[in-house]
Regions:
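Beta-sheet-dominated scaffold domains
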Residues: 1-91
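Surface-exposed loop/edge segments in extracytoplasmic proteins
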Residues: 50-57, 135-145
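Acidic, low-complexity/disordered segments
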Residues: 76-96, 151, 165, 172-176
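Short beta-strands within extracellular/lumenal beta-sheet-rich domains
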Residues: 89-113
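Beta-sandwich interaction modules
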Residues: 106-109, 140-190
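Core-facing hydrophobic residues within beta-strands of well-ordered domains
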Residues: 113-115, 125, 167
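Short edge beta-strand/loop segments characteristic of extracellular beta-sandwich folds
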Residues: 117-121
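Short, surface-exposed beta-strand/strand-loop-strand elements in extracellular ectodomains
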Residues: 126-136
Length: 195
């Protein structure tokens, strides 16, 4: 998870790069941003939905300083100053967005399940993949692409081809320019009888 990712990345850095880490709290929504080497780790927390998540960004440059001022965040890298989100707060590059959930067990980790479907509230276009084998964490099966233009919608996909497993995790990738949002992800399953 995030600790493993950060520790593995830190092992690739020099002591000077580790000591030069920079951080800031985004003034509008309270996100914590930590830059370490050329990576930025961002912690987001949404109390009303009880969701907390880490995002990782490959900046391609090392941030030496952050400043939060007048509701905006500025980052310095060498002799260049960057304004996160641009002047309007809505300007971003076309880098793909990848959302990966941890393994989900439905609060019944020892119960085998037949996954029968799922519901999602989303905006934008998302490639959806699943993994049901913790021994092969990089083995993903494509189950479809959500395409709905730019409006937030509820969609359902049939997951019966996934088969049986006590766990499932999702990877959703958006590679299109424009808004992209995932608001809810609900999994439907039936418990399988034990042998």
């Amino acid at each position: 998870l995030i600790d493993d990712d950060v520790i593995a990345y830190m092992r690739t850095l020099t002591d000077a790069q580790k000591a030069a880490a920079a951080a800031v709290q985004e003034p509008n929504d309270g996100r914590y941003i930590l830059s370490l080497g050329t990576q930025a780790y961002v912690f987001s927390y949404y109390p009303s939905s009880r969701i907390s998540a880490w995002s990782t960004y490959d900046l391609g440059f090392e941030v030496s300083d952050y400043v939060a001022m007048d509701g905006k965040v500025y980052a310095r890298a060498g002799d260049t100053i960057y304004l996160l989100g641009g002047d309007d707060g809505e300007t971003y590059d076309a880098a793909p967005v990848v959302v990966e959930t941890p393994y989900i067990d439905g609060r019944a980790v020892a119960t085998w399940k037949r996954f029968t479907g799922w519901d999602v509230v989303s905006e934008g276009e998302w490639l959806v993949e699943v993994n049901t084998d913790p021994d092969r964490p990089d083995a993903w099966s494509k189950i479809g692409t959500l395409k709905d233009g730019t409006k937030a919608t509820v969609a359902g996909l049939d997951l019966d081809m996934v088969g049986q497993s006590p766990l499932i995790k999702f990877k959703l990738t958006n590679a299109r320019i424009g808004p992209a949002k995932l608001s809810k992800l609900i999994i439907h399953y039936t418990p399988e009888p034990s042998n």
